[in-house]
Amino acid sequence: KEKASEKCARAYANKCLARFPRGMVMLLLDGIRTEVNAKCNGSAAGHQEYLKHSSCMNNHGAKLHQCMRDLTQVLDQSVDAPTKSRLGLSCCSFNTYKTCMTGAVREPCGSGTAAYVDKLITGYAGDLLDTVCINFKAGTDACKTLPVLPKSTKTGRSASLLSPLARIVTSLNG
């Protein structure tokens, strides 16, 4: 299922995005591909690690999905923020997302699962975040001084992270 989703996302990026946003989305998709291959290859160490943590993560999936919905909603809203704040809001929201995800599993599943979730997110998005978000690290003044987005009553325009991420990167390019 994850591989089919990745294939669809790559087709969307190739067909619908200009060069710069396509490159940024592909960077994220490359990270996702690496992590998916590691956990789905039965002979890889990543597979055993995934199996070790997956049951508890599945039991607390509602919290994890809420973290993703919150991230998607913030990215959707960030597109409408002033241009100079968009990148920072997006980057800092990834920091909040990572904290949400690890927090969702730390107590019920243990610190090992929280570390695994942190590692997964870094594997998925680390190259993109290191490239684009270099000036917006967790807890820095750069994140603390950004405008606060108004609390939205919408459930979000997007069901997936790809579309708002592509809109953010496209809006930065022109």
Predicted features and spans:
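Mature extracellular/luminal domains of secreted and GPI-anchored eukaryotic proteins, especially small
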Residues: 1-174
